[in-house]
Amino acid sequence: MNENKEFKPYIPAEKVTAEMTVTSVIMGVILAIVFGAANAYLGLRVGMTVSASIPAAVISMGVIRVIMKKNSILESNLVQTIGSAGESLAAGAIFTMPALFLWAEEGLCDKPSLVEITLIALCGGILGVLFMVPLRNALIVKEHATLLYPEGTACADVLLAGEEGGANASTVFSGMGLAAVFKFVVDGLKVIPADVSAAFTSLKGEIGMEVYPALLGVGYIVGPRIASFMFVGSLVGWMVIIPMICLFGPDTWLYPAAQGTTIADLYANGGAAAIWSTYVKYIGAGAIATGGIISLIKSLPLIISTFRDSMKSMKGGSVKGTARTDQDLQMNFILIGIIAMVVIIWAVPAIPVNPLGALLIVIFGFFFATVSSRMVGMIGSSNNPVSGMAIATLLISTMVIKGSGQTGIDGMKAAIAIGSVICIIAAIAGDTSQDLKTGFLLGATPKTQQIGELIGVVASGLAIGGVLYLLDAAWGYGGAEVPAPQAGLMKMIVEGIMGGNLPWTLVFIGVFLAIGMEILRIPVMPFAIGLYLPIYLNATIMIGGVVRMLMDGRKNVDENTKNDQVTDGTLYLSLIHI
């Protein structure tokens, strides 16, 4: 397609303006670390992450335009490019890496070292950028008219609107201030309780909520529809399944509970939360796995056509013009970088991956980077089935590793390491595509943005290990505070293939529940995540969704935009307490 040849970006190719400056790099690195930490906590707690591009863009505009009195839209764009890389890297890392901490808690292995986490994050992030760069001309330029890249286009619109003034940043900073005050009142002064609950003793059920602005922000962002499906999943778990378990089997015990620990004893000692953590989580994990597989199956025609079309588009090669807006990283740099990352993955002892695993990473990594880069252009990053890609990778790689003779905990750690790298590759490739679309619309230099992506990956990659260790030290993974739903699911998949020692009855209950939801045309993943997570989290998310519904009914479009910005600020600062 050649419609793009007539496209004129906001900043013409012949005009040179500030992009990569000390200010943009420092601000971008700070935001990459902050948003990466915030999204890591958010994803581990409620099983979903939010885009950082727009809040990063608004904050950068506020600082650069209002405080520093500079007028440089491309400088602000580079800030959001670097900053959003941290959010995407965290989203990929938290889906898999906490499984290693869960095994350490069970005494199967030592906790992963900071070096291991950092190298996996860096290698996955850098490969995600490098795999995507050769696709830019095919996807962003040649198919400009057909691949819309919703988040990338929206971010460009926000930056263009900011050219009229930087006042919008005040809403983000006011949201941050409100969140900081609230956290101080709840956790510092303890004037307001952090959670409230009500137990129905005769029914053996329980309902409650946690009083945190971050959860309200999530509910507001996802909206009432998704929030309600999550809440219904929790209601089914806590008001139907838990009471049924207590009613029909009080004097029995089921795996994985310790032999002799009856259901009645579990409930007497720990209440409904003990039944949830021992049994319902496995049902939820089965539902999440099924939801991911269903999502992947439904996306297969699109995935196949996406990969085929991307390969066809690349046959013509990259644009070799000298125009500033046509400049990419040189192919020899890309190839050397890919080879270097693969050698590090294979050769460094801290990463538990052998040459076969490194080969799997190259094959699956490039495939899913291509798929992710194109799919986010068609359906947006929010609908990109990264977890489904991770499940498919783990299923195949675990079977290959087991077939090669590497079994036990060593084989399981290798499978998780491979899955972690692939998950990060897919997430970063999708983010890079969105950012390059923003730059294409604004007239940014692609090469500069690609370097910015690498800077963001390195900054957040160096920080993510510390974030995971802090969360583990504060609460530990797998409990009510930090359930880590996707990581628990990946752990379950690997264990099931390697050892076959899972409570399959509970898992298949979740499978059939998910299939039932699909038959009823109810979105499976929100319901499954709600079933897996504690009801305390989803009740607060539901309230946020209701607030969004009420606000949407009363406010016009401009005010909705302002409300979204307040929510973003509230969400991100409320998570900084980690």
Where are these regions (language model features)?
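Conserved small/polar residues in nucleotide/adenosyl-binding loops
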Residues: 576-578
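Membrane-embedded translocation segments of transport machinery
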Residues: 343-434, 441, 470, 481
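Inter-helical loop and helix-membrane interface segments of multi-pass membrane transporters/permeases
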Residues: 8, 100-116, 144, 153, ...
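Juxtamembrane interface elements at the cytosolic ends of transmembrane helices
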Residues: 2-8, 130-158, 189-197, 215, ...
